[in-house]
């Protein structure tokens, strides 16, 4: 059933009864600012965003990827939220009880950085304020940022249930975080230890592997000579970081490398410092295929060296502190920045003839994702999650299809990461976030508990100190799909709405967030948190992902003010390809606004035809004309196509199908065909009534089809058309009525439009006025002649023909193949001389298009990935062009 049925949408027969005949008309000029805010308020006040529906109706649940409270949303966030809202509105109109949960993320490190920058503008350091006052400042910022973000999302038209809005530091969600931490700790999956971690000196905290961005960097490889007992030539060690050599506690060789056998059991002396270093044998650490076969071991500043030190019981000497400056262990270099120390140490080595040379070296250098500071491997005590046992069930969930990724290509990426996953450092040396629920008593006992303990459970001491660190933001975010519903409490919402159905998010947080949610969902709730993950591309500006901390953010409200929310939304939808990058520009936004204006004007025309004029209230059993049958068939096909594309998350193809139907077929096609009937120049009263009824039916279903993409515009037109304000959002979604499908009518009108297009192009090629009369001849089979003869009145009207006949072309006429039939085109006497340049130009254009289509059909990727009907359409177009080339070649030779 589709929106044609009065029981579903009130189209055709029932619209008339509700319309106030002398009514409110659409303004002449399309100005979305006049109605966007009003419609959002209406929907919200009437509870349209809440999950209501008849008993037994299916449900559809999503949780928003919570935006960070670092400030305003950028145009990239708005992209993802638009795609989610298209799904929510589509499912709601299909009869689902839709719940889409809003919320925001405290975003520990990102938000703290923003506030520190704001304080720096006032000459204030957070340490001057102290932890409590600083956190108060962040809470004040959060309140303003949340209001701003909520306002932006509302302006975009997102149909979120604001009565269920959540924040990751809300009391209930904080309880969930503590519960999860304590449970994992008691299960032995959270542990505390001293390890080398990724450290950002600028942010002053440890960061996870995923928060490190690696970039290829040109550097120098320094060759340094170490004295070795019993080996007069010493040992040559190469390093890119001579400043760390002050923390060396050994040299290492491979036990099976004959080149370094002379160093076995020897002792080296550390240059500058004079510390004795044992030469150890470590086949895991040393790659005998690389370099000299002997390496320095700096346990406190390299993760691999740290592991080797644990195997060989080596001491750990920290020479670079958490601020990126050299420590007291660095002796005379203490207090210097690490990079300044490098220069001074290189000078000293050169002066002592220990620097044997430098070589250019290209390697991958880690940078902080947030501030771009070079990451320092740093030995410190941190909290970790043992991820391996959590990853195994999450891998199986995707293997068995319990969770699927769209596009499917991300499945392989997911497996590769999950099968090589490392333990997760979850502690952060920050003030803003979830404090780690671990307490140490005066006697050194550690208590991990959901509630703050009053005394040590081991010794009874009441002198307790909570761990100063906070949890990685992603620790709380991984619980989002179920913590928003009240977990770990067994709430009604948790029972009704968990697990969710679909997650829509950017591919860049597949590992940060999506994978961790799958692991957490399975571990804590024994089910996957969602069944489908749609990973979309990223909106980029000048080749870079948009980010508030990078300072390259574009506010979506700027685009909304200029083009309207519907135009921005439609631009997003039509740009949502399956690729990794989404490019937005003013040209696309202007094109979408033009599309909205086109629909607005079509609605104004339709309303002018319906107001006070008789029209068919039902199309059943009426004598429909060819244009009527064609547009109803195309409408039904388009409805089915849009549903199919949305079901497979091809928002771009759904938008293109909608655009093609509304602009090219309904407005430029059907309206032009029936204007003579509507104006009274052609046809009788019955034909006019039917045409008006068809026009109304098409507008009703078109508004419903377009609503998920352009909700404000369609609701405004719907009110004027039906007299039922605010109801389109819950009206049934057209799914396509097979009863209207008419392949014969589609084929005939496709041929008609191809002939009209060719005549118009002919005028353009000859550089004559669009109103210049043209003579057209058609040479075809008897069956084709019969079909084309039925098209003659429309053909003469649309193509503005001076003459039309069947038979061979006249002398001097331009020959061509159009829609499988031979045609001849000529200007009236006096203008009919053959224009060889025009023919040659047309032939060149056809040759170029043939080349493009041939290349496409020879591309294996196109043949494998494109839908079958698209491939077949391309082949058909190629055959037509080859026939046209033959005809043009003949004309050019005459």
Predicted regions and their residues:
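Conserved phosphate-binding loops in nucleotide/dinucleotide-binding enzymes
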Residues: 215, 297-300, 339, 376, ...
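NTP-handling and nucleic-acid-processing catalytic cores
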Residues: 28-30, 35-40, 155, 159-160, ...
């Amino acid at each position: 059933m589709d929106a044609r049925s009065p029981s579903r949408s009130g189209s055709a027969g029932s619209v008339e009864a509700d319309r106030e005949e002398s009514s409110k008309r659409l303004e002449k000029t399309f100005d979305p600012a006049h109605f966007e805010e009003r419609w959002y308020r209406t929907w919200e006040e009437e509870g349209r965003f809440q999950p209501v529906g008849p008993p037994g109706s299916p449900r559809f649940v999503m949780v928003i990827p919570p935006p960070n409270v670092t400030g305003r949303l950028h145009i990239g966030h708005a992209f993802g939220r638009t795609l989610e809202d298209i799904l929510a509105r589509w499912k709601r109109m299909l009869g689902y009880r839709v719940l889409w949960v809003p919320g925001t993320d405290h975003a520990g490190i990102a938000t703290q950085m923003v506030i520190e920058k704001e304080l720096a503008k006032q000459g204030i350091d957070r340490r001057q304020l102290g932890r409590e006052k600083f956190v108060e400042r962040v809470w004040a910022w959060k309140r303003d940022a949340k209001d701003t973000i909520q306002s932006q999302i509302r302006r975009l038209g997102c149909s979120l249930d604001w009565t269920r809005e959540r924040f990751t530091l809300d009391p209930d969600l904080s309880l969930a975080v503590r519960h999860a931490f304590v449970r994992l700790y008691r299960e032995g999956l959270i542990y505390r230890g001293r390890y080398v971690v990724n450290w950002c000196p600028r942010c002053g905290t440890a960061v996870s592997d995923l928060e490190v961005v690696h970039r290829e960097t040109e550097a120098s490889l320094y060759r340094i000579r170490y004295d070795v007992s019993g080996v007069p030539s010493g040992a040559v060690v190469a390093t890119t970081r001579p400043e760390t050599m002050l923390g060396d506690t050994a040299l290492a060789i491979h036990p099976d490398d004959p080149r370094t056998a002379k160093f076995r059991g020897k002792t080296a002396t550390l240059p500058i410092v004079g510390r004795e270093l044992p030469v150890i044998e470590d086949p895991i650490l040393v790659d005998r295929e690389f370099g000299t076969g002997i390496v320095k071991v700096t346990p406190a500043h390299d993760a691999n060296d740290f592991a080797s030190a644990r195997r060989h019981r080596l001491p750990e000497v920290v020479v670079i502190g958490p601020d990126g400056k050299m420590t007291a262990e660095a002796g005379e270099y203490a207090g210097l920045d690490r990079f300044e120390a490098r220069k001074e140490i290189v000078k000293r080595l050169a002066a002592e003839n220990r620097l044997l040379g430098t070589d250019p070296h290209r390697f991958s250098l880690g940078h902080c994702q947030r501030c771009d500071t070079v990451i320092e491997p740093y030995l410190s005590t941190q909290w970790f999650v043992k991820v391996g046992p959590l990853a195994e069930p999450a891998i199986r969930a995707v293997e068995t299809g319990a969770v699927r990724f769209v596009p499917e290509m991300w499945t392989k990426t997911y497996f590769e990461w999950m099968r090589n996953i490392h333990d997760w450092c979850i502690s952060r040396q920050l003030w803003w976030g979830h404090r780690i629920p671990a307490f140490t008593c005066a006697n050194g006992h550690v208590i991990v508990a959901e509630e703050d303990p009053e005394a040590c459970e081991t010794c009874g001491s009441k002198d307790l100190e909570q761990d100063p660190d906070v949890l990685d933001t992603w620790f709380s975010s991984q619980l989002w799909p179920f913590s928003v519903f009240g977990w770990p409490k067994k709430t009604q919402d948790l029972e009704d709405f968990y697990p969710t159905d679909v997650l829509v998010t950017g591919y860049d947080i597949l590992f940060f967030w999506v994978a961790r949610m799958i692991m957490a969902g399975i571990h804590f709730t024994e089910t996957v948190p969602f069944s489908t993950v749609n990973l979309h591309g990223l909106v980029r500006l000048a080749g870079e992902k948009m980010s508030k901390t990078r300072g390259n953010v574009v506010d979506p409200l700027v685009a909304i003010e200029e083009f309207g929310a519907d135009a921005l939304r439609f631009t997003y939808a039509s740009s949502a390809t399956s690729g990794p990058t989404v490019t937005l520009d003013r040209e696309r936004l202007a094109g979408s606004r033009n599309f909205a204006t086109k629909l607005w004007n079509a609605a104004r025309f339709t309303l002018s035809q319906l107001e006070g004029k008789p029209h068919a209230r039902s199309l059943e059993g009426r004598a429909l004309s060819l244009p009527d049958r064609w547009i109803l068939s195309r409408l039904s096909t388009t409805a089915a196509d849009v549903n199919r594309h949305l079901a497979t998350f091809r928002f771009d193809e759904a938008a293109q199908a909608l655009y093609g139907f509304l602009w090219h077929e309904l407005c430029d096609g059907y309206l032009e065909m029936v204007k003579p009937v509507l104006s009274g120049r052609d046809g009788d009263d019955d034909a006019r009534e039917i045409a008006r009824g068809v026009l109304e039916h098409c507008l009703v279903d078109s508004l419903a089809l377009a609503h998920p993409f352009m909700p404000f515009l369609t609701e405004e037109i719907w009110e004027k058309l039906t007299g039922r304000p605010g109801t389109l959002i819950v009206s049934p979604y057209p799914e396509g009525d097979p009863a209207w499908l008419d392949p014969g009518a589609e084929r005939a009108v496709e041929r008609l439009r191809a002939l009209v297009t060719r005549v118009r192009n002919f005028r353009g090629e000859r550089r004559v006025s669009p109103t210049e009369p043209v003579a057209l001849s058609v040479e075809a089979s008897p069956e084709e002649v019969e079909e084309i003869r039925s098209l003659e009145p429309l053909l003469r009207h649309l193509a503005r023909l001076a003459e039309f006949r069947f038979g061979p072309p006249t002398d001097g006429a331009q020959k061509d193949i159009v829609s499988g039939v031979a045609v001849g085109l000529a200007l009236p006497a006096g203008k009919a001389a053959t224009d060889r340049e025009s023919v040659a130009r047309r032939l060149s254009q056809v040759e170029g298009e043939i080349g493009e289509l041939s290349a496409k059909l020879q591309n294996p990727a196109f043949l494998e990935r494109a839908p079958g009907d698209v491939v077949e359409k391309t082949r058909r177009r190629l055959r037509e062009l080859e026939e046209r080339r033959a005809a043009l070649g003949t004309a050019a030779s005459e």
